[in-house]
Amino acid sequence: MKNKIMKTAIFALLLGSSIAFAASGKVTISSPADGAMVDSKEPVKVSYEADPGPDGDHLHLYADGKKVDVIHQLKGTAEVPPLAPGKHQICLAVNTKGHVPTGVESCVNVTSK
């Protein structure tokens, strides 16, 4: 019985700490706006600002779930290679020094024409 209570307590502690861990920090993508149209022949400029929180170190830039860049500046502009015509998702995610996502991210959906 004590073993079961101990496992439950440890699980609750880990779950609570991961929720708190994911909640610290913030990423904002100011451009492109969510729902924007982008040119399929041009790279997409992504303007952003990030507060990585206490455990974050850098950002990973994703297009449709594929990592396209690792960014160490907390504010600036990055580029996603030209996107094929259609709907796409661009995300910036805060990562630790060991490249583990902290759970802090921001995403926008765009349509390439």
Regions found by a protein language model. Give the residues of each.
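Short acidic/polar inter-strand loop motif in beta-rich domains
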Residues: 69, 96-103
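Short beta-strand segments within Ig-like beta-sandwich modules, predominantly Fibronectin type-III
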Residues: 67-74
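Aromatic/hydrophobic beta-strand junction motif of beta-rich domains
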Residues: 44-52
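Bacterial N-terminal signal peptides that target proteins for export
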Residues: 1-10
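Beta-strand signatures of extracellular beta-sandwich domains
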Residues: 58-62
